[in-house]
């Protein structure tokens, strides 16, 4: 890869140096969450991990991630043993901060490795496109904001996802793709949203004869079954033996939470909530009944606290049915045409469906769409046209995660520079499509991108000057609703591109 400048390695080193400078930056409660998990896995036997509740930040990730925390705790002991004490809540010595921040950067090497494998897997004429897409992922503002300031380990996890996607490119490594994805599911269960795409693709491309779906390849079925079963047995087997599977299920899937998170993720339910809010003042004139008990608690994201003042209530069953329906649509094409591009497209559309229609979706889950889509964004200008509003909306929607003044220049300047650099570069690199571009989608993207600037200025600066500490939810609602429009518009655009390609 020496012919490309800057190289992936060079960018990774510069990015790591920049991230070290952010060590003293704002950190969210997720920092304490992971410190507490270090303490749990270090201090207690394995069978007690999912029962410990000294802190409110209980262990709610699958066993492999708990095992990763256990490994990190062995190193943490030599850095500052105090961070591993269960009762030492909200402990954040500088040694603890530096260790946990460094662990995020170190584990992100998985992403660098996966992107390097991705570039190597692409045919020579398209390697420059893969290189550009890989740099956009490595330098993603989303990963910078969520992992290196807010604090999480998404770079490591998405590295495993991308590696699994790359392994699915060749028939000879399809088995390893399925096993790698199984490992990912045992690290973080949010990737279950993508599991149907993997199931259909592996079934169609690996387990069944390419010339006839009625001729199964029994050898491949057995190998895949043994591989995937072995992974899940290693992760959950001990807990099944101890009779703790139900306890793990309660921790991993806390369905008592409300429809929307405290800050509305930019999805269909954010738009639904916005319409409900807008209808409240005009409801008496329209003769619409108002639920008085919902006026002060509309979708604040608290446990059991999801209610609408005007519009009908949304139940878990509704969100599940909508998510499943809109995931099945792209899977039909994947079943009929099981190639790698359709596989990545179906992963992206499954992520869209889960994000747009899912129950209690976090805004951080937008990366589940952006990063896989990045692998297809440069296929041609039609794909890029659908990607542009997603890139803008997805990254702007993350701004409320960092609400302190010190981080405002970092998140704003870095994100704007990334958008300008990569979207303009992508526009020059993306091939002209064989089919004509969608005129309305192009105009929508241009108008949508333009509106983002005044929105950022208002929400970050003007609102505080006008209202002080009042109406604090207004800029959040504007940001979420604006971003939701972009994500939905991008989804519709990509659905058109996917089914007409």
UniProtKB/Swiss-Prot annotation:
Protein's membrane topology: Multi-pass membrane protein
Gene Ontology MF terms: dolichyl pyrophosphate Glc1Man9GlcNAc2 alpha-1,3-glucosyltransferase activity
Cytoplasmic side: 25-63, 164-182, 242-252, 341-342, 388-389, 434-446, 498-501
GO cellular component: endoplasmic reticulum membrane
EC id: 2.4.1.265
Name of a matching Pfam family: Alg6_Alg8
Catalytic activity: an alpha-D-Glc-(1->3)-alpha-D-Man-(1->2)-alpha-D-Man-(1->2)-alpha-D-Man-(1->3)-[alpha-D-Man-(1->2)-alpha-D-Man-(1->3)-[alpha-D-Man-(1->2)-alpha-D-Man-(1->6)]-alpha-D-Man-(1->6)]-beta-D-Man-(1->4)-beta-D-GlcNAc-(1->4)-alpha-D-GlcNAc-diphospho-di-trans,poly-cis-dolichol + a di-trans,poly-cis-dolichyl beta-D-glucosyl phosphate = an alpha-D-Glc-(1->3)-alpha-D-Glc-(1->3)-alpha-D-Man-(1->2)-alpha-D-Man-(1->2)-alpha-D-Man-(1->3)-[alpha-D-Man-(1->2)-alpha-D-Man-(1->3)-[alpha-D-Man-(1->2)-alpha-D-Man-(1->6)]-alpha-D-Man-(1->6)]-beta-D-Man-(1->4)-beta-D-GlcNAc-(1->4)-alpha-D-GlcNAc-diphospho-di-trans,poly-cis-dolichol + a di-trans,poly-cis-dolichyl phosphate + H(+)
Biological process, per Gene Ontology: dolichol-linked oligosaccharide biosynthetic process; protein N-linked glycosylation
Chain ranges passing through the membrane: 4-24, 64-84, 143-163, 183-203, 221-241, 253-275, 320-340, 343-360, 365-387, 390-410, 413-433, 447-467, 477-497
Pathway info: Protein modification; protein glycosylation
Lumenal compartment segments: 1-3, 85-142, 204-220, 276-319, 361-364, 411-412, 468-476
Localization, UniProt: Endoplasmic reticulum membrane
Glycosyltransferase listed as a keyword: yes
Domain of life according to the entry: Eukaryota
Keywords: Endoplasmic reticulum, Glycosyltransferase, Membrane, Transferase, Transmembrane, Transmembrane helix
Role noted for this protein: Dolichyl pyrophosphate Glc1Man9GlcNAc2 alpha-1,3-glucosyltransferase that operates in the biosynthetic pathway of dolichol-linked oligosaccharides, the glycan precursors employed in protein asparagine (N)-glycosylation. The assembly of dolichol-linked oligosaccharides begins on the cytosolic side of the endoplasmic reticulum membrane and finishes in its lumen. The sequential addition of sugars to dolichol pyrophosphate produces dolichol-linked oligosaccharides containing fourteen sugars, including two GlcNAcs, nine mannoses and three glucoses.
Alphabetical list of PANTHER family matching this protein: DOLICHYL GLYCOSYLTRANSFERASE, DOLICHYL PYROPHOSPHATE GLC1MAN9GLCNAC2 ALPHA-1,3-GLUCOSYLTRANSFERASE-RELATED
Family according to the record: Belongs to the ALG6/ALG8 glucosyltransferase family.
Protein name from the UniProt record: Dolichyl pyrophosphate Glc1Man9GlcNAc2 alpha-1,3-glucosyltransferase
